[in-house]
Amino acid sequence: MFDAKLGYDDVSIVPEVVTYMESRKQGNPYDENGMLPIYASPMDTVVCEENIEDFLKNKINVVIPRNIDFCRRIELGKKYDVFFAVSMSEAEDICKFYEGEYGSTCMRTDESYKICIDLANGHMDKLLTICRKLKSFENAHITLMTGNIANPETYVHYEDAGVDYVRCIIGSGSACLTASCTGVFYPPFSLIKETYEIKKRIGGRCKIIADGGIKDFRHIQRALIYADYVMIGGLFNKAIESAGKTTYGKSYWNVNGNKIFRPLKTLFTYGREIPREKFDEAYRDFKAGKLAIWKQYRGMSTKEAQKNIDANAVLKTAEGKTFYQKVEYNLSGWVENEVSFLRSAMSYTDSRNLRDFKESKWVINMSFNYNK
């Protein structure tokens, strides 16, 4: 029998027959640490040193990207108690440190660390071996995140390896070309649903992160039916605080007293870069309709991102792309909306917390014709 797999826009959440919550405010959209079930993706056009506090004060979890110096990543991870991303080779070096092969490093055996092994292909046995090693050292106190995976059954291997968080979904991010270039893909809603079912069946403790393809608020709520967390890149890039290169220009030309909106390409040609200290001023002008502001956004496998991580690296064929997105909001405004929308979804499903929201009823959409 044909087994159809579903994306986020193939399903809708169904309300309970009768609900007993009197207000959406009775729903608690935060996890046990008081944070939203959302991570900012470790991308160099999303997270930077200067905006970590912006994310955290808005209750968004952060993973520090690999373009920042290794020792500085560790320092920031400790300062803010957040995950920092490492490459496969850096993860191997960390293993050697705990094995006593390195006499001097930025790490200490009496410290705890939150490490994200940031890899596109989380199906490699070599990665699983590294994960087992990192979780087996008696002198290591490591909370470990890794991935990405696009086969539900791989979850069992990461659970057995002692991994704490696994990132699911390959190829569906707006700056990712893996699916279109390689043909590798697993529709995201079905992937996290089937991964969750395996987790539930085996009593797994490794948390599921839906990472990629989140294009709107509705996708977040649908992902959270089965995922513990959602990881977001493109939506956060469209916030004024994001790390992407920021350009601006008047959004129109004045021709004989008439406003003629400028073609997109002229903004990139003639627009000037906005320094971070001018973001607030630029955002006020944007809200007043005086400026158009654009953010560079790129996948971390693009050659530009590879060079930003290591200027001397041998560049690989890119499975990502670079483009510009129009700034649409600031972080606090976006978060205010998401909290309200998530609470509303929880009230429809009579869910007072995120645990109650798990396994909310849903149906397959035969047509997608409501307002996006």
Regions found by a protein language model. Give the residues of each.
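Active-site entrance/lid segments in N-terminal catalytic domains of soluble metabolic enzymes
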Residues: 1-207, 234-239
